[in-house]
UniProtKB/Swiss-Prot annotation:
Gene3D superfamilies: SH3 Domains (2.30.30.40). This is High osmolarity signaling protein SHO1. Residues 187-258 are annotated as: Disordered. GO terms for cellular component: plasma membrane.
Length: 320
């Protein structure tokens, strides 16, 4: 039986070396202590959580020793699991923040934090009314850890563009180049039509905005091996050609006509340097206020106070 699968000529973009370079740019990054030390929120919360865990550890050791079954003072065995679970939870959050991969694992982090919060609150309920100093100290450690856990759930469960999280991140020294610390990699991938990662760690396709990025569509051809239908050629009226089709008015390729209205205002939460290969992008500094014409999509048409117009990445801006 004759095969109908002829040889196909695929677009060269499938084997584009620039795409391979872009993929390598987004591989797992190493640990950078500057992400912890330079971020007051991360430094404070991880330090308090570690201190609370140490209190829980020593309180559990002495509390287990001081239990008295005759007085109905029994140490809850599940508290040991909660102790170990929170140890790995704090350690995991430390590495996630240090490697600047919170946007990749934020969903898993929130789930694990919820489990840890349930264990901590259950331990508090069983230890705080015991009347034994060591058990009450353990309960105090769990209370402190639960407070940090609730703050973490709110932080990691919020989008980077949320007002409270953007305000917290504005104090970080490294977040300006790190939130989208993929800024340098994003510029590399701009040539391939890939935008910055969104809040869920995925990448969105965006059209090329520069004239150099306008290329004719790739044609995918194949051998039909007798399946073609030549009758369709005879159905085309004689004298009909593409010249009879009205053509749209010619314009400058790659040129974006700026809108006349800018009803929105947005504040830059991070500085952004425009791609020098894309004339439609604009640069702006941190805390600069821009006028926005449309808030749909990943790239917004913006106008600066100087009158300069262009497109700006939405994850660097927050609406006012």
């Amino acid at each position: 039986m004759q095969s109908y699968g002829g040889s196909l000529n695929y677009s060269p973009s499938f084997n584009n070396p620039k795409m391979e370079h872009g993929r390598n740019s987004y591989r797992r990054k190493g640990i950078d202590m500057g992400n912890i030390i330079g971020d007051p929120f991360a430094l404070a919360t991880t330090s308090i959580a570690t201190l609370a865990w140490i209190i829980i550890l020593f309180g559990s050791i002495f509390g287990y020793r001081d239990q008295d079954p005759d007085k109905n003072l029994i140490w809850p065995t599940y508290s040991w699991f909660t102790l170990v679970f929170n140890f790995f939870l704090i350690l995991g959050i430390f590495f996630v923040i240090a490697s600047d991969s919170a946007q990749t694992y934020h969903v898993a982090i929130v789930g694990y934090l919820a489990v840890g919060l349930v264990g901590s609150t259950s331990s508090i309920n069983n230890l705080i009314y015991s009347g034994v100093a060591s058990m009450e100290a353990t309960a105090a450690g769990y209370i402190l850890l639960s407070m940090v856990t609730i703050i973490w759930i709110f932080y990691f469960g919020s989008a980077p563009s949320a007002v409270p999280r953007a305000y917290i991140d504005s104090f970080a020294l490294s977040k300006e180049s790190a939130l989208p610390a993929h800024h340098m990699s994003r510029q590399t991938m701009n040539h391939n039509g890939l935008s910055s990662p969104n809040a869920y760690g995925s990448y969105n396709m965006r059209p090329e905005t520069s004239a150099s990025g306008l290329q004719p569509p790739q044609m995918y051809t194949g051998q039909l091996n007798g399946l073609e239908n030549p009758a369709r050629q005879s159905q085309i009226p004689q004298g009909f050609s593409s010249n009879n089709i009205p053509k749209p008015p010619q314009g400058t390729e790659g040129e974006i006509v700026p809108p006349t209205e800018y009803p929105y205002r947005a504040k830059a939460i991070f500085s952004y340097e425009a791609n020098p290969d894309d004339a439609n992008e604009i640069s702006f500094s941190k805390h600069e206020v821009l006028e926005i014409s449309d808030v749909s999509g990943r790239w917004w048409q913006a106008r600066k106070e100087t009158g300069e117009t262009g497109i700006a990445p939405s994850n660097y801006l927050i609406l006012l």
